[in-house]
């Protein structure tokens, strides 16, 4: 996935978007796959 404002996709094992559109490895974040929001992850790393 590519987070808002990012010109490169997130790492495969860090495919999360933070509140400011940044790529994050830990929660809280939005797990993404393509352009579809999968689920909120508040405690675990998105994988």
UniProtKB/Swiss-Prot annotation:
Keywords: Disulfide bond, Ion channel impairing toxin, Knottin, Neurotoxin, Secreted, Toxin, Voltage-gated sodium channel impairing toxin. It is found in: Secreted. Pfam families: D_CNTX (PF17492). It comes from the Eukaryota. The keyword Ion transport does not apply. The keyword tRNA-binding does not apply. GO terms for molecular function: sodium channel regulator activity; toxin activity. Expressed by the venom gland. Transmembrane segments: none annotated. Disulfide bonds join 3-17, 10-23, 14-46, 16-31, 25-29. The presence of a 'disulfide through disulfide knot' structurally defines this protein as a knottin. Inhibits the inactivation of voltage-gated sodium channels (Nav). Belongs to the neurotoxin 03 (Tx2) family. 06 subfamily. This is Delta-ctenitoxin-Asp2e.
């Amino acid at each position: 996935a590519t987070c808002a404002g990012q010109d490169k996709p997130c790492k495969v094992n860090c495919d999360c978007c933070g509140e400011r559109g940044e790529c994050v490895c830990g929660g809280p974040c939005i797990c993404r796959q393509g352009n579809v929001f999968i689920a909120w992850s508040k405690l675990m790393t998105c994988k």
